[in-house]
């Protein structure tokens, strides 16, 4: 009985370790001038006049905002807590899932005309933008992304317990993606943002799981 207990405990602890992401081992794309990692929290000063956007509506393409990421294959659930000192129009921070400069999804909080919005940009050659306006300011938000088959589901939460979907978008299946934390200040002089409790948990491949279920 004791032996069984220790084996079970080891398995549970191992599972937690797999889902946790050590921030020090991640990589920068467009590293900002100031950033710090303390107690597995990332704080950065978002680069002024930086963003991610391709072509549609505005007519320009930019790919120069700070993005701190690790690369993952297969299917997964990723989440992060975001708290920012948003100041200027379009200041934004959240999670990004990226294949390359023409294929990515970014989702989080975006500050527009004095209001806080849950914002998602989906880019496949050209970008689109969807928002959900919040009725009051928030100190922080949780963003969760679930990759299954050829789709990414994006959720938000105010307490890391009850999650609400904000977007379901296509993303090419069976390609490694960069997953991490992003901030942008397209119209401003930058701002400070803190990301905490970032984690990525592997999920069993849905197609393979379905095949195994039907071929027992």
Predicted features along the sequence, with ranges:
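Bacterial Sec-dependent N-terminal signal peptides
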Residues: 1-22
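Extracellular glycan-recognition regions
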Residues: 21-216
């Amino acid at each position: 009985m004791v032996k069984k207990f220790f084996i079970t405990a080891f398995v549970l602890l191992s599972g937690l370790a797999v889902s946790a992401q050590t921030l020090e081992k991640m990589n920068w794309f467009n590293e900002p001038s100031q950033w710090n990692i303390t107690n597995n929290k990332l704080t950065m000063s978002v680069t002024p006049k930086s963003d991610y956007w391709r072509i549609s509506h505005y007519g320009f393409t930019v790919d120069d905002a700070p993005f701190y990421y690790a690369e993952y294959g297969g299917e997964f659930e990723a989440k992060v807590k975001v708290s920012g000192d948003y100041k200027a129009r379009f200041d934004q921070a959240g999670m990004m899932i990226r294949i390359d400069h023409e294929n990515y999804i970014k989702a989080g909080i975006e500050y527009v005309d004095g209001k806080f919005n849950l914002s998602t940009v989906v880019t496949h050659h050209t970008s689109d933008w969807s928002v959900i306006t919040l009725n009051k300011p928030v100190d922080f938000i949780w963003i969760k992304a679930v990759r299954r088959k050829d789709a990414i589901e994006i959720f938000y939460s105010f307490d890391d317990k009850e999650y609400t979907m904000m977007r379901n978008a296509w993303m090419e299946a069976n390609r490694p993606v960069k997953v991490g934390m992003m901030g942008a200040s397209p119209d401003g002089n930058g701002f400070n943002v803190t990301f905490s409790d970032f984690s990525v948990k592997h999920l069993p491949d849905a197609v393979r799981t379905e095949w195994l279920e039907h071929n027992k």
